[in-house]
């Protein structure tokens, strides 16, 4: 409940149209499959310092939803990476350095916001 109040306050402050829904912890596999079912047309990305930079126009215009997976401090496990590959997740770099989770989430949000702005401008 506390986190939902924080999400509501943040959404109001940033004048967001939608309110994010928060849920309790799940296994990585369960969470990824749940997101895939809920958003079947979403582009699935994961943070990877060796991944590609997002290029404006590189994705289909009808795919406007994003699922972003940010790994733990030590990186994704081999099993998690295998699952991401099976699900056709794209490794994406948002910074030339490895970021902490708090910073990575903000960086991904900023990069995707800019990406959508540049794609819409085309």
Where on the chain are the PLM-derived regions?
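Charged, amphipathic alpha-helical interaction segments
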Residues: 12-16, 52, 110
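Short acidic loop-to-helix transition motifs that present clustered carboxylates
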Residues: 27-28, 52-54, 99
């Amino acid at each position: 409940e506390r986190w939902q109040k924080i999400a509501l306050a943040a959404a109001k402050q940033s004048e967001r149209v939608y309110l994010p829904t928060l849920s309790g912890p799940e296994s990585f596999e369960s969470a990824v499959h749940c997101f895939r079912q809920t958003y079947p047309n979403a582009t699935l990305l994961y943070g990877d310092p060796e991944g590609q930079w997002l290029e404006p126009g590189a994705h289909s215009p009808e795919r406007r939803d994003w699922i972003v997976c940010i790994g733990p401090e030590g990186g994704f496990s081999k099993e998690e990476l295998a699952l991401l590959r099976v699900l056709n997740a794209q490794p994406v770099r948002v910074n030339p350095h490895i970021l902490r989770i708090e910073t990575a989430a903000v960086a991904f949000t900023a990069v995707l916001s800019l990406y959508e702005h540049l794609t819409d401008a085309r």
